[in-house]
Design a protein with these regions (language model features):
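Short, acidic/hydrophobic/Gly-rich beta-strand patch recurrent on exposed beta strands
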Residues: 34-37, 98-101, 191
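Extracellular trypsin-like serine protease catalytic domains
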Residues: 164-208
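N-terminal compositionally biased, intrinsically disordered segments and leader/signal-like regions
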Residues: 42, 89, 148, 191-192, ...
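Short hydrophobic-aromatic micro-motifs
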Residues: 50, 55-58, 100, 127
Length: 208
């Protein structure tokens, strides 16, 4: 989930990486973020509740898994299998986005949705439920061989077990249109900076 001026777990730079697991003070919609458990795996994929039983997620989640249930705020809801609707762009091309309805209605959590693209240099808060990160930094050479801190040109975090809903902050560094193999969309990029502060974040695998 993305909100301006405000997506699954995100990776944060601060501490041991386990922080920010409850709603931020200036909450842009924590209660609207849920997840789908992918079949035959122990992983989940992020969904956002829009209201009136409608959810949105990446189309590739539906393509690979055809999920039957969604979990939101601790409760599980069955998906109406006839409600899946793929989103198209104004040009008529398919986007990597799909909406669906649940059979029963979740609580009504108000959600504000932007009517325009997020501009460059805008501050964003990301909420997601993707993979966790390792406690300590790992280091790589310029050829991406694993090394130690003394020989490292690049540093970052490798994946850890499990996933956790988490939030973080970043700044939009650029925008572009792209095809991810499942549809065309307008997107934006953020950079995971070492000096970005304890809430500096980047989206993780399964943050779809």
């Amino acid at each position: 989930m993305l909100a301006a001026g405000s997506i699954r777990a995100v990776i944060i730079s601060g501490g041991d990486g386990t922080g920010n697991a409850s709603a931020p003070a200036d909450d842009p919609g924590w209660a609207n973020v849920g997840h789908i458990k992918l079949a035959n795996t122990n992983t989940v994929s992020t969904v956002t509740y829009l209201g009136d039983r409608w959810f949105i997620t990446a189309y590739h989640v539906k393509y690979f898994d055809n999920p039957q249930q969604v979990k939101l705020a601790g409760s599980v809801y069955s998906i109406n299998s006839n409600s899946w609707t793929r989103i198209t762009n104004s040009t008529g091309t398919n986007a990597d986005l799909v909406v669906f309805q649940t059979v029963t209605r979740p609580p009504n959590f108000p959600l504000r949705i932007r009517s325009s693209q997020i501009p460059n240099s805008a501050n964003v808060v990301m909420i997601g439920d993707g993979r966790n990160r390792a406690t300590n930094l790992s280091y790589w050479t310029s050829g991406w061989a694993v090394t130690n801190s003394a020989g490292g040109v690049y540093s970052g975090y490798v994946w850890a077990a499990g996933s956790t809903m988490r939030w973080g902050q970043n700044t939009v560094s650029s925008r572009s249109s792209f095809d991810d193999g499942f549809g065309f969309q307008n997107g934006f990029q953020t950079t995971f900076n070492a000096n970005g502060g304890s809430n500096e974040c980047q989206a993780a695998t399964y943050d779809s």
